[in-house]
Amino acid sequence: YYWYFSGVLTPRFCDDVIAYANEQKEVMARTGGYGDRKLNKQEVLDLKRKRNSDLVWLNDTWIYKELHPYVHKANRNAGWNFDWERSESCQFTKYKLNQYYDWHCDSWDKPYDRKDPNNPEHGRIRKLSMTCQLTDGSEYKGGELEFDFRNYDPHMRDESKHRVQCKEILPKGSIIVFPSFVWHRVKPVTAGTRYSLVVWHLGK
């Protein structure tokens, strides 16, 4: 259910992304139900029970140019052959001490319904998700990426029996690609900082 490339991105590329993103304004990570509106204190607390991290949105050609060949290769080699057309903005994510993202999947039951029908995301759905490891696994502790390949929230039943920890992408510059409907999580970081770059790829 996933395809990985170990250490394929150069350390310079990873460091350039980190440096560039750290110059931008970071925001608190949200889940889909909260939108862009200002949250009250209770909503922030509720959100952080599910997801606690900081992120920066990036939309730069030099990043996509580096990553897209691996998406195409994974899509072909894994035999998924999803028909995807475009990528959303890249999500540069910082997981600092005790930060995490609990079980979730990246796609919804219905395609995006944007107010502007000319929005390139309108009528499209997330088909493939990609995570790029920008820091080496030796630079932090915790922060493990785990999967549950069943088609429902792992909290609902026998979570411990079905989770699969992805150790193949611990080297810096590694990439993992998987269908966006697959449930996954990032466990709490217990030391250091984990930097990653997440991109979703859309199609009809």
Regions found by a protein language model. Name each.
Residues 1-177, 181-204:
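Fe(II)/2-oxoglutarate oxygenase catalytic core
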